[in-house]
Amino acid sequence: MANIKSAQKRAVQSEKRRQHNASQRSMMRTFIKKVYAAVATGDKAASEAAFVEMQKVVDRMASKGLIHANKAANHKSKLAAQIKKLA
């Protein structure tokens, strides 16, 4: 642990941010997994509904800087292509 007061504060803030970011990242991954699961069942309506929810979450995480914008785009395009195949 740091000795300087400001460094101690930064360490505490950093740990809080790390835990929050881990929680947000886990939540985002869960939404992505829900889309993959819906695609695996072959139900296009359920897949599209899950995709819309996932898209909102992924875009929010990208706008907040939790993931890169290109990574968000890759997730969305890959899953959109899989849903399109279900037709």
UniProtKB/Swiss-Prot annotation:
Q: Which SUPFAM superfamilies match?
A: Ribosomal protein S20
* Family matches, as HAMAP family: Ribosomal_bS20
Ranges for the region named Disordered are 1-26
Q: Which family does it belong to?
A: Belongs to the bacterial ribosomal protein bS20 family.
Q: Which Pfam families match?
A: Ribosomal_S20p
Q: Which GO terms describe its biological process?
A: translation
Protein name (record) = Small ribosomal subunit protein bS20
Identify the domain of life: Bacteria
Q: Which organism is it from?
A: Glaesserella parasuis serovar 5 (strain SH0165) (Haemophilus parasuis)
Q: Which UniProt keywords are present, listed alphabetically?
A: Ribonucleoprotein, Ribosomal protein, RNA-binding, rRNA-binding
Extract one GO molecular function annotation from the record. structural constituent of ribosome
Taxonomic lineage is: Bacteria, Pseudomonadati, Pseudomonadota, Gammaproteobacteria, Pasteurellales
* InterPro entries documented for this protein: Ribosomal_bS20 (IPR002583), Ribosomal_bS20_sf (IPR036510)
Gene that codes for this? rpsT
What cellular component GO annotations does this protein have? cytosol; small ribosomal subunit
What is its biological role?
Binds directly to 16S ribosomal RNA.
